[in-house]
């Protein structure tokens, strides 16, 4: 596995669980608001690459104190070794939460069929007709829709997540997006952090807005 980060303990990434978090290298989207730019290239920096053996050693040591492992990215489903890696996690008795953008339903289908994931969180970037704008690429919307259906019908715990990028999405867009969420599925809105955006224009707009805010008297 091409791993780019490892957090041995997290209380907020796996709902209701104490978990470790593993970050995979590489993403097929180029969302202008992304704040994890270092994870986008498929080729990792040798200086920051995380050794899988070290991760497994730490998890083996702590497995009785952890409730699960979150595999996030980047986009984990780009990793050819993902099923093998998840099987290693399951042999430790750890539940697995997968964070995905939903662009590879074929991979997701295999993981669900082999019961390698216990929770799936899928990003829902925008109304379907605005996906190219919010992902920065000409993406296959039908693939995301297929992943959504797989998740909802799998019986696995799941959630859909959206970052509220106000410069790129309107109130009408948010309403249309909410209509895309399957009935009965959890949907959460995430904070947009413009200071770390990939698009310099979003960073500049945030800086300008901050500069225009009145300051409290000393």
Which residues does each predicted region cover?
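N-terminal [4Fe-4S]-dependent radical SAM core
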Residues: 1-23, 32-44, 61-65
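Hydrophobic packing within well-folded, soluble alpha/beta domains
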Residues: 27, 31-34, 89, 98
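Non-heme iron-sulfur electron-transfer modules
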Residues: 41-56
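Conserved AdoMet/S-adenosylmethionine-binding subsite of the radical SAM
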Residues: 56-68, 77-204
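Conserved strand-to-loop "acid loop" that flanks and positions the catalytic carboxylate
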Residues: 74
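A structural motif corresponding to the C-terminal lobe/cap of the Radical SAM core domain
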Residues: 205-209
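Terminal, non-globular segments
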Residues: 214-218
């Amino acid at each position: 596995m091409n791993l780019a980060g490892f957090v041995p303990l997290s209380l907020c990434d796996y709902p209701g669980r104490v978990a470790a978090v593993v970050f995979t290298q590489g993403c097929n989207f180029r969302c202008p608001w992304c704040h994890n730019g270092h994870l986008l290239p498929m080729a990792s920096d040798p200086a920051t690459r995380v050794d899988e053996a070290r991760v497994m050693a730490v998890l083996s040591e702590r497995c009785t104190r952890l409730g699960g492992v979150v595999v996030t990215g980047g986009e984990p489903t780009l990793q050819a070794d993902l099923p093998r890696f998840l099987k290693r996690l399951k042999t430790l008795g750890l539940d697995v939460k997968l964070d995905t953008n939903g662009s590879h339903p074929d991979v997701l289908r295999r993981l669900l069929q082999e019961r390698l994931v216990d929770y799936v969180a899928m990003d829902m970037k925008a109304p379907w007709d605005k996906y190219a704008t919010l992902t920065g690429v000409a993406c296959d919307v039908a693939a995301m829709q297929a992943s959504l259906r797989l998740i909802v019908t799998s019986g696995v715990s799941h959630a859909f997540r959206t970052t509220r990028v106000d410069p790129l999405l309107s109130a009408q867009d948010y309403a249309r997006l909410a209509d895309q969420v399957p009935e009965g599925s959890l949907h959460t809105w995430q904070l947009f952090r413009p200071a770390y955006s990939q698009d310099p224009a979003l960073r500049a707009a945030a800086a300008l807005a901050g500069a225009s805010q009145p300051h409290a008297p000393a």
